[in-house]
Amino acid sequence: MRHEYSNLKIFAQGGDAIKAAEILRGEIESRTGAMPQMTDSGKADISLIADPNGLRDGYKIEQSGSRLVFRARGIRGLIFAIGMFLRKIEVSGEKITLIQDIGGEYKPDKRIRGHQLGYRTTPNSYDAWDLEDYRRYYLDLMFFGCNTVEHIPYDGLGAQQNRLMKYDPQDFLVEASRIADEYDLDVSLWYPNDRESLEDAEKRRRRVFERTPRINVMFPPGGDPGDYDADEFISRCRDFSRL
């Protein structure tokens, strides 16, 4: 069934829900030119609820006609719910049409759903991005259910500041991680095992880890670069896991 909205009204309960509501309001304004108003729960078309007993990596949508309630433990699940809504609407001027019912409980099949987007000179485009471009990309990924972004620490990988790549890569990583943390978006670091002493490798990693606000995963590729035998590779990974 299709449901139409004009002058969309939103209610939010809980700190993360208020943050998520601001994201939803911004997305609607960018599509319609009209900023939805905040209201109380009895008048809201969409209510966002931060529920301590809700899903962290999923969400519930309760639907009664055109009225919707998005429910999740925190901002991550609420952003996922917003993404579902945005993917199922059509916009014409200021009119929004939900093209199908979307009520239900949504849980991911895969625990890790990530994308690598390290700030460096080797990509074709996003070395020219700034932090707000990354914020935009993070949200776009989360609207489709992504829960992890993977960055690449700068360890002499050839990244140099220039007229396109304006920021220090390591400083950029720190701030990009901070933005990810605002959205409860997991951060993975792609960190290869190069030919260097364990002591030097630990020092380099410790410097990065101490500066970076959020790190959930360190991913050490088995090669390209790195050519350790399996036993030594695993041993070094275990040492790094204790940092």
What name fits each language-model region?
Residues 1-110:
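Contiguous, structured surface segment used for ligand recognition
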Residues 109-243:
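Aromatic-lined carbohydrate-binding surfaces of glycoside hydrolases
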